[in-house]
Amino acid sequence: MADLASRITKPDEAPAAAPEAAPVSAPASEEPKAPENETSIEESQSNLVKNEYEVEIKLSDLQNDTESPLYSVSSFDELGLPEAVNRGLLAINFKKPSKVQEKCLPLMLSDPPRNMIAQSQSGTGKTAAFVLTVLSRIDLSKPHQPQALLLAPSRELARQIQTVVQTIGQFCENLIVEAAIPGAISRETGVRGSVVVGTPGTVMDLVKRRQFDISQLKVLVIDEADNMLDQQGLGDQCVRVKNMLPKTIQILLFSATFPDKVLRFAERFAPNANQMKLKHKELTVKGISQMFMDCPTEKDKYDILCKLYGLMTIGSSVIFVRTRETANEIQKRMEADGHKVSALHGAYEGQSRDVLLDEFRSGRSKVLITTNVLARGIDVSSVSMVINYDIPMKGPGEREPDAETYLHRIGRTGRFGRVGVSISFVHDRRSFEALSQIAQFYGIDLIQLNPNDLDDTERKVQEVIKSSRAQAEYVPSATDSAV
């Protein structure tokens, strides 16, 4: 890989060493890929069976059960899904399982139920995988008895997962899916659905108020599990929720990223779990052309952003910033300069956030400025560009590059076999070293854009966005052995 620092236009500034890739054991290779969430869930499957990348499947009982070899399925018919679920898959044009579905579903649907920790790239069908498991486990003759609980880090993602369950389960008679998010559950009736999708805090409140009968829950799903289990507050809430649930519950943990520290905790949270892992360098999607712009100063970032506005509106675009204040400031300045943009972050009330995201999904709003509240899981099929206005950082004083958040941010584009562009702004030694470390960690070559040659930038970006074929194959590993 050509080193980012060698191509960045700042002399005398070498990047710090990249963090080492976490060691993993041995891989098992294969093929496919598929959707993760709402809206474009109906459009995807025809592109999904072409991709090949290596995975590692670790069966917790591999040494004890020699008669249960790892196997995969080549069609949904082989899974023995309920007829109504198969009809739902056909209605949304899901013809063959993606890689994560092909590998995980036979394990998650086995009896007796086993826990699962699954890692797969953004936009490859994780949501559909756990939704199919949920719909196969619940008893539809008890529509008002909660039987499956799906937790997400934000109301936006919870609402989106709710829509996916309803879409795939559209032919499941008596299926009731409720969102356990602030303001959604009536105090008078409480939770009355067989599938409940929510955020941990609201779920805990409902249980404490005796408005959520958890006694017959069969499945617990945690989406974006690395973030949910690692984030202070959310992690504690997840543990408390789990401790309230029946001991026999099946636990499914899904995310695109699982840092070692979080994975160790996840293995305790979901004991004896089957696992699906990927190599670090298989985590980014080739369909996303990853670029960077070396801005002369921090102030120049805004001017360059405005010059890119025409490109941002070819499809839809998401601009990620570090703080709510920055989001508000950019929105005001861009609107004053005659550009139509929206901003969404945690300071907005829940219903306002719902309206803003719905407007963005529908295309009424095409440029959305946001914080990391939308970095994970959100699926809007029209997003063709992601801009990292601020490089994601973490740790005390935000001095450490946040490679996981970078991956989740850029994963808002290039979904389900489509192409997309991500452009990261750097302006000083700290920001370009951070981006360099992220690039080295994932083994990616970033394309440099010249801030003084917007014609060339336009050509490079349009080449990708207007491409007639979405070649979203996964980045091959640097070697054939496991990292």
Curated annotation (Swiss-Prot):
A motif (Q motif) lies at residues 74-102. One of its GO terms (molecular function) is mRNA binding. It holds the Pfam family DEAD. It is an enzyme of class 3 (hydrolase). GO terms for biological process: poly(A)+ mRNA export from nucleus; protein transport; translational termination; tRNA export from nucleus. Keywords: ATP-binding, Cytoplasm, Helicase, Hydrolase, Membrane, mRNA transport, Nuclear pore complex, Nucleotide-binding, Nucleus, Protein transport, RNA-binding, Translocation, Transport. Residues 304-455 form the Helicase C-terminal domain. It is found in: Cytoplasm; Nucleus, Nuclear pore complex; Nucleus membrane. It is a peripheral membrane protein. Residues 107-276 form the Helicase ATP-binding domain. PROSITE patterns: DEAD_ATP_HELICASE (PS00039), HELICASE_ATP_BIND_1 (PS51192), HELICASE_CTER (PS51194), Q_MOTIF (PS51195). It comes from the Eukaryota. Its EC number is 3.6.4.13. It catalyses: ATP + H2O = ADP + phosphate + H(+). A motif (DEAD box) lies at residues 223-226. One of its GO terms (cellular component) is cellular bud tip. Residues 14-29 have a biased composition (Low complexity). The Q motif is unique to and characteristic of the DEAD box family of RNA helicases and controls ATP binding and hydrolysis. Belongs to the DEAD box helicase family. DDX19/DBP5 subfamily. Associates with the nuclear pore complex. ATP-dependent RNA helicase associated with the nuclear pore complex and essential for mRNA export from the nucleus. May participate in a terminal step of mRNA export through the removal of proteins that accompany mRNA through the nucleopore complex. May also be involved in early transcription. This is ATP-dependent RNA helicase dbp-5. It comes from Neurospora crassa (strain ATCC 24698 / 74-OR23-1A / CBS 708.71 / DSM 1257 / FGSC 987).
